[in-house]
Amino acid sequence: FNEEGSLYILKGDRTIEFDGEFAADVLVEFLLDLIEDPVEIINSKLEVQAFERIEDHIKLIGFFKSEDSEYYKAFEEAAEHFQPYIKFFATFDKGVAKKLSLKMNEVDFYEPFMEEPIVIPDKPYTEEEIVEFVKEHQRPTLRRLRPEDMFETWEDNLNG
């Protein structure tokens, strides 16, 4: 813990810094997001529509054979690194995957306000490969301010 006045949440072996407004309702919402599963499962066309309406945040979605798949487990482990700031979604349904143009064990990365996703190359992936890709592509972009992350800041890249 290196910042005075910061709030840190310990979850398992992870330390998560809270970068939001110090208001009771915001803190409770943040903590509730942390206790949810790191990956939200999409099983229906209605859930696909809800997924598509999330346009102002980074999100990832993958298509996997089952929850027991080693590739899904790697995806789930990677999601824990970014929870609750980046939303991870998965489907095991072929119809949903077809609607989203996903292939088996493929993960799509959506930037805020972008229509088309970036397909993470070289599938299937390990947890480390997914984490590395997200960190590399996670960048300051136009996005809606939310109380739970309104004070998040990025380091300037002085080397261009």
Curated annotation (Swiss-Prot):
What InterPro entries would the database entry show? Calsequestrin, Calsequestrin_middle_dom, Thioredoxin-like_sf
Q: Which UniProt keywords apply?
A: Calcium, Metal-binding, Muscle protein, Phosphoprotein, Sarcoplasmic reticulum
Gene Ontology molecular functions: calcium ion binding
**Cell compartments where the protein resides:** Sarcoplasmic reticulum lumen
Q: Fill in the PTM field for this protein.
A: Phosphorylation in the C-terminus, probably by CK2, moderately increases calcium buffering capacity. N-glycosylated.
Please give a single GO biological process term from the UniProt record: regulation of cardiac muscle contraction by regulation of the release of sequestered calcium ion
Question: An example Gene Ontology cellular component term from the record?
Answer: sarcoplasmic reticulum lumen
Q: Which SUPFAM superfamilies would you find in this protein's record? A: Thioredoxin-like (SSF52833)
Q: One Pfam family name from the record?
A: Calsequestrin
Role of this protein: Calsequestrin is a high-capacity, moderate affinity, calcium-binding protein and thus acts as an internal calcium store in muscle. Calcium ions are bound by clusters of acidic residues at the protein surface, especially at the interface between subunits. Can bind around 60 Ca(2+) ions. Regulates the release of lumenal Ca(2+) via the calcium release channel RYR2; this plays an important role in triggering muscle contraction. Plays a role in excitation-contraction coupling in the heart and in regulating the rate of heart beats.
Q: Could you tell me what this protein is called?
A: Calsequestrin-2
Organism the protein comes from: Sus scrofa
Taxonomic path: Eukaryota, Metazoa, Chordata, Craniata, Vertebrata
**Gene behind the chain:** CASQ2
